[in-house]
């Protein structure tokens, strides 16, 4: 069974596809890198403002940012 779970696997995958580091994402969201890293690990959940901004930055028009990746589904 995989340790990938919302939002970690999808958020990391989208960020890397866009070529952003955690530091760059944090800067764009005006939060600390640690806070952003906590979103990816699932230790913290982003507020609505940051969810909307992440979707804009990552080019996600729907709520795919919050769905598990295909790898996560197949590993369950």
Protein language model regions, located:
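Conserved hydrophobic/aromatic packing and binding residues within compact polymer-binding modules
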Residues: 11, 25-26, 36-39, 65
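Short, charged recognition helix plus adjacent turn
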Residues: 1-2, 14-17, 56, 64-76
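Residues that mark the N-terminal boundary/hinge immediately upstream of a DNA-recognition element
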Residues: 10, 21, 47-50, 61
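Short, basic-rich loop-to-helix N-cap that marks the start of a DNA-contacting helix
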Residues: 43-55
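Short basic helix-loop element that most often maps to the first helix and adjoining turn
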Residues: 9-28
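Recognition helix of helix-turn-helix/homeodomain-like DNA-binding domains
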Residues: 31-45
């Amino acid at each position: 069974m995989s340790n990938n779970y919302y939002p970690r696997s999808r958020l990391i995958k989208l960020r890397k596809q866009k070529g952003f580091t955690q530091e760059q994402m944090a800067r764009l969201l005006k939060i600390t890198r640690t806070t952003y890293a906590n979103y990816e690990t699932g230790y913290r959940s982003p507020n609505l403002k940051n969810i909307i901004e992440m979707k804009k930055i990552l080019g996600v028009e729907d709520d795919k940012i919050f769905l598990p990746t295909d790898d996560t589904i197949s590993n369950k």
